Amino acid sequence: MSENEIKGILGTKLGMTQIFDEENRVIPVTVVEAGPCVVSQIRTVETDGYNAIQIAYGEIDPRKVNQPLTGHFKKAGVTPRRHVTEIRMDDVSGYEVGQDVTVEIFNDIKFVDVTGTTKGKGYAGAMKRHGFAGQGAGHGNQAAHRRVGGIGAAATPGRIFKGKRMAGRMGNDRVTTQNLKVQKIDADANIILIKGAIPGNRGGIVTVKTAVKGGAHA
């Protein structure tokens, strides 16, 4: 497994706090309980067309696992887990089914990408959802202060283009925040402190992977 290989782990967002660095500056950090995960499957170019490892995370009552997944975990020789995801990589030779994946894989990593599901906001207007400025407060405005305004053109094209920014359901999207600094790792507690905010609620499931841009080892 090369030094620049993509590494990843599933975890739970516990919340935010702040710590002090070596120069006594306050650093806002997100606390993530990362792993431990277990490798439940290995995909290779020969069998699947690409290289990846499948990792499983989180406790679950075996009675709540459906039969296909029960058989999948039984074949791998691991106890059923609640969450499963794949981490694509160029070389999977350093992994084997049943191997534990812990937060220690990030010991030499400086920057990571974090993927999670953002907080759902429900149905929201265009000002909240897209940051529209709104319309004038006076000068003949008839109760349209927060409305979108004109959304069409003329007889040609005679329709509203797809993707037009309007009111609608906001949040609950899968989002990746890139190039976040790894501030500290506590291997004994399976904790990783990541500088800044990451997507999602407290208790949300996130995927932490080595940064694909900017150099994870920078």
UniProtKB/Swiss-Prot annotation:
Keywords: Ribonucleoprotein, Ribosomal protein, RNA-binding, rRNA-binding. PROSITE patterns: RIBOSOMAL_L3. The keyword RNA-binding applies. Pfam families: Ribosomal_L3. SUPFAM superfamilies: Translation proteins (SSF50447). One of its GO terms (biological process) is translation. This is Large ribosomal subunit protein uL3. It comes from Corynebacterium glutamicum (strain ATCC 13032 / DSM 20300 / JCM 1318 / BCRC 11384 / CCUG 27702 / LMG 3730 / NBRC 12168 / NCIMB 10025 / NRRL B-2784 / 534).
